[in-house]
Amino acid sequence: MHFIQPLQAFLQTKHIVEFSSIQQAVFKVWPRQNVVGIAETGSGKTFAYLLPALNQIDVTLNKPQAVVFVPTKELKWQILTILNDIKASFTGLKVSENFNSNAHLIVSLIGKDIILHETIKYVVFDEVDMFLEDSSQAEWINCVQLFQKHKPHFGFFSATLFNEQLQQIRKQVAPLTVVNQKKRAWKHSLVKHFLLNLNGQEPFAGLLALLNYHHNEQVLVFCSNAKSLKQLTSLLAHNQLSFKSLHGQLTPNERKHIFTSAANNTVRVLVVSDLLARGIDLPHFSVVISWDLPLVDSFYIHRSGRVARFNSWGNSYVFDLPHNQHKLTKFAHKGILFNSVHLERDGTLKFPQLKQSKQKPAVSSELKTAIKRIKAGYKKVKPNYKKRQKQQIAELFAKRKQRRSWKNF
């Protein structure tokens, strides 16, 4: 895809010179066609739909031209932050969360404040499977049908979209091109899953052991409901542990402040409800602990995906408790392999199946192709060719590391 000059300038500023598989595939069809984009968490779905839509914006037309619907305030703030950064290179671009503005691109929740503009030609639903849940499906259908009056192109994106949900989308929007870059819906190649055997001790003792073991890392602790979260935060406060909590009962300003602090690497332990399991990028976090398992099975994949963002490894822990066995059995049948961890009496952790060798960085298909291209350039053996070849490959990895925080989107 050829991007207009402002977007080229932005990509150059962020040192983005290659695109992920989902981005490359979506660029071929969106926004000329209705598209469903499915790819694992942290693969770059946001840029997959955002860059092509921005590429079509006419800044001389002071009317809304594209809208992105998201299911949570946190995801809305995250996308608006990205757009505000893009605006530095995109003179004249206006973005907003309000439909009563003349912004070119609107990022919004689904609600009563939606205003239909005939100039809106591109409509995206991010984390679309959340809109397809029973409690919000009717509102989503009404929203889609409202915008269909002016025949825009639709984009639907998620990390977990099953056949039944895909059929629900097809009933509302046709024709539809499906771009599926996730062949194994329940597995993420960069997440290591661990099952913590408490050996008769309390779950909180296990949590303390995990926090101690990962004392140099940032940790997300997920709770499935408000009662569970309140109980856990009380225990943490009673034990004088430093943490922040983020949940739906906070005011919007409180939620935004805590979310921004976590995104800016100033929070080590963040206790959250499942509202943060979807689409949120917290690049500094590398550990997820499920204090209890989510009510919706697929949310476990989204929880663990918070710490495996575009070629970075993540660890996800679950407690081996009787009331978790039913869901754990279902996860196992879906192909999730849990490594066994034991809580010792002295509060330490034993990893009998964990190799202590340093994990090798994951290599994307694009990077593999670039490495092959370098090696192919040395068909004739010349003095010091191995040294030069090794240096070129090292520079590739260095560039990837420099780009990683932005390629997460």
Swiss-Prot record:
Enzyme Commission identifier(s): 3.6.4.13
SUPFAM superfamilies cross-referenced by the UniProt entry: P-loop containing nucleoside triphosphate hydrolases
Domain of life: Bacteria
InterPro entries attached to this UniProt entry: DEAD/DEAH_box_helicase_dom, Helicase_ATP-bd, Helicase_C-like, P-loop_NTPase
The keyword Hydrolase is annotated on this UniProt entry: yes
Gene Ontology terms, MF aspect: ATP binding; ATP hydrolysis activity; RNA binding; RNA helicase activity
Domain Helicase ATP-binding: 26-179
SMART domains in the record: DEXDc, HELICc
Chain location of the short sequence motif DEVD box per the record: 126-129
Keyword Hydrolase: yes
UniProtKB keywords: ATP-binding, Helicase, Hydrolase, Nucleotide-binding, RNA-binding
Cystine pairings recorded for this chain: none
Residues binding ATP, per UniProt: 39-46
Similarity remark: Belongs to the DEAD box helicase family.
Protein name: Probable ATP-dependent RNA helicase MG308 homolog
